[in-house]
């Protein structure tokens, strides 16, 4: 991305698919690090959109426990410790759940490791949603199982783990967690009905009511414990949706209830059998074959070749535990429904949970005859694939002209993409894709060898010799773990932060810091086609440098002065919103003449806005303020803000001023008072949605204090505290072995 790629560079991004991890999710962590260090809290941010309730960002997971690590640790230490903690939580959670379901130590440990390294955790690693939320789900299932087994002390653990899962993800992941809990309820309800039928009793609605009530209480308390984040995020989502700005709710709405049309669910079904061998679906360094199936590499559901095959084949059978069948059914079928429009194929997380349990249960309980049959069939399948693929590869060697034509076609198709400007990079990706078509390419050879190792291990487990059987046992475990490690290694990018800083300083960033400073604000005019490759500092990335912008890119957007991409180059309009500078790609010929050029490079052109108004402006009376909003010539008195903080500010007001206008989005929760006074007043929302303060006339200078204390966060915190009290009381009551 510009301006970090330099002219003549021969190295390109290993994984461009996670570019929003750089432009958004790593930036969120940097914001958390900065605000927790400076102010001890994450609240308001003036760095994007002209001001937004940053703490309520639905995609940032600011309520997750790993965010608190940034209070005490440096950025990368907090990042790595948080990931390690989530991996361990996921692994031990699945281990505990499988052990509670009667799975032996070795297969349970294998299941835990496969779950901790499953493809959904890996592909969304930079976003942290999937792992942050679903690392807790096995613990939710384990706690429910413990309560069902008679351990009443497990009662408070269920809502506690649900809350941790809610806080670790997005609103989408909250829904996925709720579905997982609902599947557990359905499993228990069916068991309850079967038990009642066995005793000759009826199990109608009345009989199921206590069970449903228990799960409902758990869910409500889990939501209550996380209400301090859940309520603000839900409010932000509803606000953005009301404005028609929430991408997932509005994209392609006129075309179909499916984002990619009615063919989408059919193609998704066709792609399901390919999940067991994901290397054929492309890689982040070449091409994404799943796009042909109206999907993408983000949505691979891989946790080892044999485990996926077992889940797809055996997971439906009655010999598998019902909870496996229900999780697999939910994970595979729900993405084919209109729910995929709102929850995407992240629903595959349910399939992964059920599939890992099905795999562990199969190898724990399958007899020698069953394993022999499976080993023979898999060996035959592997041999057929290897021989056939080798033959095709040899044929391809004799058709180099056709392969070159295919490569050129791929490059030309990608020329119109966001990164199409980087033609050498497109050529490299196409070359890699062509190379990966051959069976002996490392992309395909290593997974095939690991699959052969696993099949050999499965064959050895059928031996009557105990030593060979145990060897096969460990070959399977080692093979499937090696598979998920290989998948992860091909996705994750490793670098030395000291040699390659996350947001390196460039001549462009230095001039922006110097010219814009802490009081200015930037607007960005993007490249019309190759915006990701050509536009310097794509939205949100300037926040990493503490440079404020009027635009941003998130799933939710504030109801503020300017909507996204509205009038990005209108100097007069933007000047009223405190926009002092315009950034655009080098050589942009279409910048309006109102902007004054001050710096140019191959990567970036920088312009100043002569029409910019000060962010903090004073007015002698209301008439002057109204003239400011209705005309362009009204003079203002620039004011100084002393603190440099986001959530608590101090503005020096000279004598004779009675009104203050702040070129920042007004939002509920902003209050002000004259320093030394006790009473706080609400900030007024101006007609252009900026902030206005009526401080009254005074013949002496004063200090005005502002604070940001949103009501929705206060209400959510109160609900969380009340829920915590109920959970504690319920836990103490449940500890007396009273069933409720």
Q: At which residue positions do the language-model features occur?
A:
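Membrane-interface coil-to-helix junctions
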Residues: 1-91, 113-134, 250-303, 333-336, ...
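Hydrophobic alpha-helical membrane-insertion signals
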Residues: 1-55, 237-241, 489-492, 496-503, ...
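Periplasmic/ER-lumenal interhelical loops and adjacent helix-loop junctions
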Residues: 13-16, 22-36, 40, 218-311, ...
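Active-site-proximal, structured, solvent-exposed surfaces of multi-pass membrane proteins
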Residues: 40, 623-735
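Membrane-embedded helix bundles of polyisoprenyl
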Residues: 91-101, 105-190, 214-234, 239, ...
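Contiguous transmembrane helix-bundle modules in multi-pass membrane proteins
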Residues: 110, 129-135, 143, 147-153, ...
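Hydrophobic alpha-helical membrane-interfacial segments at the cytosolic entry of transmembrane helices
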Residues: 204-234, 249-252, 329-332, 376-391, ...
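Extracytoplasmic
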Residues: 251, 413-420, 427, 433-437, ...
């Amino acid at each position: 991305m510009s301006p970090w790629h330099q002219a003549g560079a021969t190295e390109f991004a290993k994984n461009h698919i996670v570019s929003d991890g750089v432009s958004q999710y790593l930036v969120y962590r940097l914001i958390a690090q900065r605000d927790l260090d400076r102010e001890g809290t994450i609240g308001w941010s003036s760095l994007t959109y002209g001001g937004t309730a940053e703490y309520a960002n639905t995609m940032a997971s600011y309520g997750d426990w790993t965010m608190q690590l940034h209070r005490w640790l440096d950025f990368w230490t907090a990042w790595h410790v948080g990931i390690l903690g989530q991996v361990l939580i996921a692994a031990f959670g699945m281990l505990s759940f499988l052990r509670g379901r009667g799975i032996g130590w070795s297969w349970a440990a294998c299941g835990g490791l496969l779950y901790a390294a499953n493809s959904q955790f890996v592909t969304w690693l930079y976003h942290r949603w999937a792992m942050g939320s679903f690392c807790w789900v096995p613990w939710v299932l384990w706690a429910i199982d413990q309560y069902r087994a008679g351990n009443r002390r497990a009662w408070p653990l269920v809502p506690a783990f649900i809350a941790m899962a809610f806080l670790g993800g997005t609103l989408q992941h909250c829904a996925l967690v709720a579905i997982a809990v609902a599947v557990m309820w359905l499993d228990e309800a069916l068991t309850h009905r079967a038990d009642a039928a066995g005793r000759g009793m009826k199990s109608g609605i009345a009989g199921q009511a206590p069970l449903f009530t228990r799960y409902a209480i758990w869910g409500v308390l889990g939501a209550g414990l996380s209400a301090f984040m859940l309520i603000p995020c839900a409010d932000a989502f509803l606000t953005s949706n009301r404005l028609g700005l929430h991408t997932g709710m509005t994209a392609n709405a006129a075309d179909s209830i499916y984002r990619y049309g009615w063919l989408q669910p059919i193609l998704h079904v066709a792609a399901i059998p390919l999940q067991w061998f994901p290397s054929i679906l492309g890689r982040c360094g070449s091409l994404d074959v799943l796009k042909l199936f109206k999907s993408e590499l983000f949505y691979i559901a891989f946790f080892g070749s044999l485990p996926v095959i077992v889940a797809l084949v055996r997971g439906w059978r009655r010999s598998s535990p019902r909870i496996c069948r229900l999780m697999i059914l939910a994970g595979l079928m729900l993405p084919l429904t209109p729910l995929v429009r709102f929850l995407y194929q992240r629903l595959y997380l349910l399939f992964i949970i059920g599939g890992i349990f099905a795999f562990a249960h199969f190898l724990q309980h399958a007899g020698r005859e069953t394993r022999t049959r499976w080993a023979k069939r898999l060996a035959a399948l592997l041999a057929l694939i290897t021989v056939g693929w080798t033959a095709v590869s040899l044929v391809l060697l004799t058709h180099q002209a056709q392969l070159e034509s295919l490569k050129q076609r791929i490059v030309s198709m990608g020329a119109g993409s966001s990164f199409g400007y980087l033609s050498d990079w497109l050529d490299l990706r196409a070359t890699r894709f062509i190379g990966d078509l051959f069976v002996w390419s490392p992309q395909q050879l290593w997974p095939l060898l690991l699959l052969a190792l696993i099949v050999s291990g499965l064959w050895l487990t059928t031996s009557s010799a105990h030593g060979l059987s145990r060897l096969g046992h460990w070959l399977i475990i080692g093979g499937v773990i090696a598979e998920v490690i290989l998948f992860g290694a091909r996705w994750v990018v490793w670098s030395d932060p000291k040699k390659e800083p996350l947001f390196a300083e460039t001549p462009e960033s230095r001039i922006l810091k110097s010219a814009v400073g802490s009081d200015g604000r930037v607007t960005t005019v993007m490249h019309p086609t190759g915006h990701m490759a050509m536009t310097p500092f794509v939205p949100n990335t300037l926040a990493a440098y503490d440079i404020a912008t009027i635009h941003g890119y998130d799933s939710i957007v504030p109801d503020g002065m300017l909507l996204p991409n509205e009038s990005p180059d209108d100097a007069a309009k933007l000047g009223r919103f405190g926009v002092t500078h315009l950034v655009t790609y080098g050589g942009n010929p279409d910048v309006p003449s109102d902007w004054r050029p001050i710096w140019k490079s191959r990567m970036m052109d920088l312009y100043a806005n002569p029409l910019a108004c000060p962010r903090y402006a004073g007015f002698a009376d209301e008439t002057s303020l109204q003239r400011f909003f209705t005309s362009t010539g009204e003079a203002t008195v620039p004011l100084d803000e002393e603190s440099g903080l986001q959530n608590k500010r101090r503005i020096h007001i000279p004598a004779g001023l009675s009104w203050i206008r702040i070129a920042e989005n007004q939002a509920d929760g902003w209050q002000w008072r004259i320093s030394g006074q006790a009473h706080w007043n609400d900030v007024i929302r101006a007609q252009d949605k900026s902030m206005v303060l009526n401080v009254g006339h005074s013949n002496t200078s004063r200090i005005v204090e502002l604070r940001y204390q949103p009501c929705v966060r206060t209400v959510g915190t109160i609900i969380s505290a009340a829920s915590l009290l109920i959970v504690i009381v319920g836990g103490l009551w449940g500890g007396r072995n009273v069933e409720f």
